[in-house]
Structures are given as structure tokens and as C-alpha cells.
Design a protein with these regions (language model features):
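Active-site-adjacent loops and short helices of periplasmic peptidoglycan-processing enzymes
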Residues: 227-376, 384-387
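Sec/Tat-exported extracytoplasmic proteins
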Residues: 113, 144-146, 150, 199, ...
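Penicillin-recognizing serine hydrolase domain
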Residues: 226-246, 339-487
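Divalent metal-coordination and catalytic microenvironments
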Residues: 109, 453, 504
């Protein structure tokens, strides 16, 4: 693709240089207009010729080409700019057995048997997007069946309940213990998928324990939209210095992998684990419940979050010391609230449900070297959080958060980085320095893009991430590869001067006065020897 941000920057610089030249020469030559115009012609000709030549000689290639590594990485496998994608898990019903597919965009639940569509039901309510209780997308299975289940949170009966993960069920319309129906309300539930009671009863009778449940909760990207735009490199020869063992840059919206090195290599991830801990807690821990901090929760090494034995704190409030100060005590408290073993199993189940098939977790803190993942899987996690649990990303970028006697301070190195949208960093001896961050970057001509940057096995995550950010801002472009909007400056012909303005040229007040005095306010006279400029609109 030839459309690049670089030419527009050059044009703006040209405007500034020319404006400065005009100002300087007018002040120097005063009313001596002949000397003034001659100097302008000389300066403009030299400047524009250089700009045109530089733009013309730039090599323009697509991002799909291999990019050189740093000198330090020459002996290693080079990273590549790649146009692969990590999309939402593509759905196909099981060829043998039963499958439940829920589309929370169209609000439909469909049943399949041996790969064939059986029936489609209308979904009446789902968890509110962006809230604690947003219905989680992913791949699950029916865990339990109850003809009626009493919600410990809402204190209502949920008829014909099918539990598929943590506190989430598919069920009929709820009713109070008095027998009165639950009000219709806004169409949002506490996270469960509500059907009419009649439909839920029919689904309940058809469903078996372990029946697959596939839930789609993300706005679809049309294939044509993805093909219309793409990522391109401006200068293929420009080097990117990254010392991390593995890294990846991906577009959150399209799923495109832009840059990567060893992105499928399984590595320990340290406290990046806490993003999965936070995500799992929203699904399996009752929110806004009080938990008492027990002494054994505080025995784990590392950051404490200033939690004290015996104090009571809301389960939802523990997200803040967990993500802002990387509190290991907060992670252990959340896990032990419902049973540590069950919580860790739920972390692994959640990872599998959202497509993190090469990840496994052994604790809720990241201290264990057995908490492993890949850059690709962590990109999937970032994409899932951005599309389904924005609340967690918002929490992770708060500078401070106060609750009761506690004030937690964000220790992220990237908090003041332009465009930072949230994430988590970590460190252990086996993992070295790690980071998952989402950044909103101006790599498109008209719109910023949310890009996930994952760095694993780094000796300096801040430097590696900053180098990647600088490279993206200066050398990667996202746009539409169409010839009719291609920007191209031909080489200047001998004795020919051309100039393209990307905007207005702001002149000093003294220049305006001189033009009014000497040229009766006709600014085109400044360029009288340059007919193309003088006659231009």
C-alpha cells in the first residue's frame, strides 16, 4: 500500500519551513521586494525539490514482508510482520451429540443434534454488557440440571436451570418465593440467559449433562470490512529492537497479528496471571459479598495490598489491590473465598472456554512457574477483556482507588503512556519481566486503533514495549489500499518547482503588514516567479 502517514507529516513540515523562510526573508529584506522574491524562489525550490525527491525515493512495500531484527537478535529466529488473525472461536455444531449455541447479539438460542439444527428459541434477557454480571462468551458445557434453582443473590426461583459455568445459568423466567413473577424490567439479567418458562422447560428436557454450550457475545466483524483495510509497513528496512523471548502486537477489533516473534512459545507469565484471576472472580465469586481476611491469606510472598488479618472487605473491592498494586494477598483471598482448588480449576476452564488452549494456571497470583501461556493466548485474553469485560481494563488503569480506609496506587510503568487502555505487568525469576497492555494508537489516517502488546521473557519490558510503540507510531499504517486515494509525488522536472500544502501557512504579523504595504494585500505576489503556486487556488 502506498497511502502512508509519512507524506502528510513531510508536507506539514514543508509548510512550517516555508513559512519560516518567508518570515525571515521579509524581515531581512524589508521593502526590497526583488531581493525578497528572489530569495523566496531559491529557498522554496531547494526545499520542495528535496522533499519531492525524498518521498519519491522511498521504497513502499506491504507489511507482509519479513522485517530485519536487531543486531543482538541476528542469530535468533527473526520476528515477522504477519497478517494472520486470532478471531473469535469459529462455531460449528458437533457432528455427533448435542450442542446449544447462544448468540447474544441476535438474542437467539439454537439447538443442534448430530450437526443438524433442531430449534431456535428467543432469549429474553442477558447480563448487562460492561457490568459485573455481563454474560460470558466462550465454550462451556452443561454442569448441572435443576427443575428449579434458588438464586442465592437474587433470592428468586429460576425454573428449569442449566448451569454452564460458575454462577451462570440458562433458565426460565424467574419468580419470587411468594410465587409472584419477577418483573420484566430492562431486559438485563444478573448474568444468566433467560428464556420463557415454556421454552426453558422444553430445552431442559432435551439437554443432557455435558451438552456443549457455545456462547457468542461479541459484535461480528463482516469479512468484507476486514478485507477492505489492512496493515502496511512504511519502511521495511527500519529495525525494531526487542530483546524479549516472545512478543506479539495484535489488533483487538479485527484479530490481525501485526508483529510477532515466538508468539506460540509457552512461557511463564508471572503476575499477568492476575488478569485471569480477576476475570474468573467475576464469573464464580459472588460480587459485593463481604469476606474476612484470614491470617493464612497473608502468608504468600510478594505485594500485600495493605490487607490486614481480621478486616472485612467486599469481594468486588479486591479487584483494585489485585490489579493496581499486584497484591498476591488479594488473589489468594478471592481464591480461598470459594475454595482455592475450585477457583484454580475455574481459571483453567475459563482459559479453555475463551480459546486459550496453550495456557494453564497453578495459582491465582502468578508466583508459580507453572502459570504458563503464549503471546497468542494472551492476545486472546486481551481481546476477550476488551470486548466482554471492559470494566476490568478500566479498573487496571485507575491511578488510585479508595475504599474505606484503603487507598491503592497503580504501580504500572505504562500508566502515563499516551493511549494506554489498561493491562498488567509481572516479574518472577523464571518468567523474567512480562507485560500485557492495550494501547489506542494513531496508526490510521482518520481513526485510532486499539492494539494489544504482549511481551514475555524480557529483561526490560518497559524498553521493549516502548520500542514497539515507537515503531508502530512511526512505521506501521492501517488503511484502505485503493489506487484512487494513493498519495504520490513524482520526481521534479528540471527547473520545475511544485509544492503541496497540507493546510494553511501561518505568517508572522510583520509579514502581513509588509505584503499589505508592498503588494496591496495580494499574497500571491510572494510567488509571482512560481506560476504554479501563484495561479493555485
Amino acid at each position: 500500500m502506498i497511502v502512508k502517514r509519512f507524506p502528510y507529516i513531510i508536507i506539514c513540515l514543508a509548510s512550517i519551513i516555508i513559512g519560516a523562510t518567508i518570515t525571515f526573508t521579509l524581515l531581512r529584506y524589508g521593502a526590497n521586494t526583488e531581493a525578497f522574491v528572489g530569495n523566496v524562489k531559491s529557498q522554496v525550490s531547494h526545499t520542495v525539490s528535496s522533499i519531492a525527491s525524498n518521498i519519491t525515493n522511498r521504497d513502499k512495500k506491504e507489511v507482509s514482508a519479513e522485517i530485519p531484527t536487531t543486531e543482538a537478535d541476528v542469530e535468533e529466529e527473526p520476528f515477522r510482520i504477519t497478517l494472520g488473525t486470532i478471531d473469535d472461536i469459529s462455531f460449528a455444531p458437533d457432528e455427533i451429540g448435542k450442542t446449544i449455541r447462544v448468540n447474544l447479539e441476535t438474542m437467539e438460542l439454537s439447538t443442534y443434534e448430530n450437526g443438524t439444527l433442531q430449534k431456535t428459541y428467543k432469549v429474553l434477557a442477558k447480563g448487562k454488557p460492561g457490568s459485573y454480571w455481563e454474560t460470558p462468551g466462550g465454550e462451556y458445557q452443561v454442569l448441572t440440571k435443576e427443575e428449579r434453582h434458588l438464586s442465592s443473590v437474587g433470592k428468586v426461583w429460576m425454573p428449569y436451570s442449566l448451569q454452564f459455568f460458575g454462577n451462570f445459568f440458562i433458565h426460565g423466567w424467574p419468580y419470587y418465593q411468594s410465587g409472584e413473577d419477577f418483573p420484566v424490567g430492562s431486559g438485563y439479567s444478573g448474568g444468566c440467559i433467560r428464556l420463557s418458562t415454556e421454552d426453558a422447560e422444553e430445552l431442559y428436557g432435551w439437554t443432557d449433562i455435558t451438552t456443549r454450550v457455545s456462547i457468542y457475545s461479541t459484535k461480528q466483524i463482516n469479512e468484507s470490512d476486514v478485507k477492505e483495510n489492512g496493515y502496511f509497513v512504511i519502511d521495511p528496512k527500519k529495525k525494531l529492537s526487542v530483546g524479549a523471548t516472545s512478543f506479539l502486537v495484535g489488533d483487538i477489533e479485527t484479530g490481525e497479528i501485526i508483529l510477532e516473534k515466538n508468539s506460540d512459545k509457552e512461557l511463564p507469565i508471572a503476575s499477568v496471571t492476575k488478569l485471569m484471576t480477576a476475570l474468573t472472580s467475576l464469573d464464580v465469586v459472588s460480587q459485593r459479598k463481604e469476606v474476612t481476611i484470614l491470617p493464612q491469606y497473608l502468608e504468600v510472598q510478594g505485594q500485600s495490598g495493605d490487607l490486614r488479618a481480621g478486616e472485612k472487605i467486599g469481594t468486588n473491592d479486591l479487584i483494585y489491590p489485585l490489579l493496581l498494586e499486584s497484591s498476591n494477598d488479594a488473589g489468594e483471598t478471592l481464591a480461598n473465598f470459594i475454595g482455592r482448588g475450585y477457583f484454580i480449576k475455574s481459571m483453567n476452564d475459563k482459559a479453555q472456554a475463551i480459546g486459550m488452549t496453550n495456557s494453564s494456571f497453578a495459582d491465582p497470583t502468578g508466583l508459580s512457574k507453572d502459570n504458563i501461556s503464549t503471546s497468542q493466548d494472551l492476545f486472546r485474553l486481551a481481546k476477550y477483556l476488551k470486548e466482554n469485560k471492559q470494566f476490568l481494563l478500566d479498573a487496571s488503569k485507575e491511578k488510585t482507588h479508595t475504599e474505606g480506609s484503603h487507598t491503592w496506587y497503580n504501580t504500572s510503568q505504562f500508566l502515563n503512556t499516551d493511549g494506554y487502555e489498561g493491562g498488567k505487568r509481572g516479574y518472577t525469576d523464571p518468567a523474567r519481566e512480562t507485560n500485557l497492555g492495550i494501547f489506542n494508537l494513531p496508526v490510521s489516517e482518520f481513526h485510532d486503533r486499539s492494539l494489544a502488546i504482549v511481551v514475555l521473557g524480557s529483561e526490560d519490558r518497559y524498553r521493549d514495549t516502548k520500542n514497539i510503540l515507537d515503531y508502530l507510531r512511526s512505521n506501521i499504517y492501517f488503511g484502505d489500499d485503493k489506487s484512487d486515494i494513493t498519495f504520490y509525488v513524482p520526481p521534479p522536472a528540471p527547473k520545475d518547482t511544485t509544492l503541496v500544502f497540507g493546510g494553511d501557512v501561518m505568517l508572522d504579523r510583520g509579514v502581513k503588514t509588509s505584503v499589505e504595504k508592498n503588494f496591496a494585500g495580494d499574497f500571491s505576489q510572494l510567488f509571482s516567479p512560481l506560476t504554479k503556486l501563484k495561479d493555485a487556488d
